[in-house]
Structure formats: C-alpha cells, structure tokens
Amino acid sequence: PLLISQLVRIACLQMALQPVWEGLKDERWSPQQLAVIENQLAKIDLLKGYRISLLGERDFANLMIDQMGDNPKSAGMLLENDGTIPGYWLIPQGWIYHLQRRLNEMHVKFSQRIVDPKARRIRPDIAVTFATEVQARSSRSFPIFDVLSSMLLPAIEKVAIKIGSSQTAVDHTRTACLLELHKLEHNKYPAQLTDLKTPFP
C-alpha cells in the first residue's frame, strides 16, 4: 500500500459519509441500521493506514535505490536520463548509498513522526518542519545528495493533515450514530457523551 491508496480511500469515505449524515438529519435510519453503520465506522483507522502506507513508500523507495546500485541504467531512468547524457553509468555506489541515507533520514526524523496512531494525534509542527526541510534541501544550488528526497518526499505532510481531518470526520459520524441510537432507545439525547453505552471515539 502506498499513500495514493489512502487518498483514494479518503475520497471513497467522503462520498460514503454524505448519505449517512443525510439519513441522520432526516431521521431515516433504524436502530439496526445505525448499529451496523457505527460498527463499520469503528473499524476505520486512517492514522494506522497512513503509517502503513508511509512504510510502503519508504520500502518502495529503498527497493528503487537498491536497483539503482545493481543496475546503473535504472539510475539513468530514475533521473530522467534517456542515455543521451554520457557518464550516468559512472555514478559511484557511495553516492547512491548517501542518497538512500538522506531519504531514510527524512522519514525517520519527520514523516514517520507526523502521525502518532497510538496517541491518536497529528503533529502539524513536525509537518511544517518537514516541509521546510524538504524545501531547503531541494532549493540548494547543487542538491546532489538530496535528489531523491526532492522527488519522493514532497506533499507527504499535506497527506498527513488530510488524513487527520478525514479521521475526524469518521469519528464525528460514528459519534452521531451513537447519539441517535441513544435517542431512539431513551427518547432523548444523553446529558453527556460518557452516558453512551459504547465509548465514543
């Protein structure tokens, strides 16, 4: 799984949540239907999905870099060299390893820390620092050791923020279903969320 799969997942969720809210507004859902919807929403963990897809991005990048080391022509293709520029096959192995180290350094220091699935937190401060560092690396006059970082890392912080807002939308919808279930059972909304039978998100 890659980040693009999470973006597609978010797009599908946005379309799926709209009719749920319309049904809640018009009080069309039965208790059984609400229970099914709430149960399905409870299984959705976009923060965990982000982390899994980010590890996939990192593993995919490392695979490409390994292929660059094994086959110099792969490096030429990745760097958009169609072979008309001589000497791309002379790229030293040490340079490739340094590219790999710099790329993984960005993942370990920043992108993998933007989202904390266990604490259920998004860290915008780390996302901003990450974006600033990517920009600084790519804007150097001769970013020879950050070529891959510039190509493979941009926009990760935006995806993390989007995933956070989408998970919030899922949690809000689930909470609304629990509130409606309580209302159907007791003919009124609970005085506080802790009165719900199922712990709210």
Report the location of each language-model feature.
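Short acidic linear motifs
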Residues: 1-201
